[in-house]
Amino acid sequence: VTGLTGVSINRDHKPGGSGTVGMTAYMAAPADGYNVLEHIDDASSAHALDSSRPNPAEDLIPLVVSQVTFSQIYIRSNETRYTDWPSFVKWVQAQNGKATIANVSKEGSMERVIMKFITEASDMQIQQISFDKGAPRYGASLGGQVDALFEQPGDVRKFLDAGNFKPILTVFNERPG
């Protein structure tokens, strides 16, 4: 951004809590026009779960939206127990709560909240297995340690291009083209 604007920008990365640490630091900083926050969808999820957290619709003014993406549920391309969403739901329902899906580890994240709504709407009981990092999450999916994967397509692009995963459900307002 510095190269585009000609303005020196000091980056102050605050890891932890899926952005909640950074949000807390940002909200404590002076509202003087010199502080800018880069944030992901977890700001909305955090507020939805705890209304004392900053409300992105009221407390933040968006300057730029850099990416709008969708989430998908993936299975291994060579999976034989189920091949599409209807057969996956039927299979999960028959497992009596023993089916698993790899997901992010942060309770209250957008991914986990959406997966909760999906399972309720589909009358499924599925264990969300938490992984802090993508590589172990994708490895567990490829290796068959979990039955499915909840992710965004950009994060698993190389696996999609290689034919390792295939989406069986897309969560988006319109069908991706």
Where are these regions (language model features)?
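Sec/Tat-exported extracytoplasmic proteins
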Residues: 1-5, 13, 30, 38, ...
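Short helices/loops that flank or line small-molecule/ion binding pockets
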Residues: 20-32, 116-117, 121, 135-149, ...
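Short, Asp-centered acidic motifs that coordinate Mg2+ and/or phosphate
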Residues: 33-37, 72, 147-148, 167
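C-terminal lobe and pocket-closing loops
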Residues: 68, 83-84, 155-177
